[in-house]
Amino acid sequence: MGKLFGTDGIRGIAGQTLTAELAFHVGQAVAAVLTEEKGSRPLITIGKDTRISSDMLEAALMAGICSVGGDVMPLGTIPTPAVAFLTVQQQADAGIVISASHNPYAYNGIKVFNAQGYKLSDEMEGRVEDLILNHAELPAAVDGAVGRRHHGMHALHSAYIRHLLGSIDCDLTGLRVLVDCANGAASATAPDLFRALPLQADFI
């Protein structure tokens, strides 16, 4: 286990131990390592949960990635497995999840997936950590080399919902379900998923 990355990414109290500045440097370091590996501009997906600090951390990560020439594909509020799926489906070079799972609301976290949708290897995490902890001065992208933000979030959500629908192999006709997304990470996609099923869904 590294100094920043624990067993499930980087976690801390948002604004204290997990600051916007740290998120910016994580974005820079991830993009720089991927650029070195790939030899060209990387594409990184970013998904988040609904914690109040997620928008701040997303903006900082995106700024860090773009500042060293990486492109970003924001996925918005979406479950962690969706980030892994869409990273692979969109042929991105990595995916980042902003979430602290079961931790109290004041916490947040940054988890990085590789191009195959799996947890970043210890070796790659170590390289990212080294750049951050050694305060490496990464060359800034200028002019046309600055990274860009990709659009089309709604279409990406739809692609994930189609994937989920394709995994259902039982008859749901006639069921009535009550759905409480509890303002969680699935709250932006679950309603469309249930409405596409042959059942009656009521939402809280």
Please give the residue ranges for each predicted region.
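General beta-strand structural signal in soluble alpha/beta enzymes
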Residues: 5-6, 46, 72-77, 97-98, ...
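Ferredoxin-reductase
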Residues: 31, 38-116
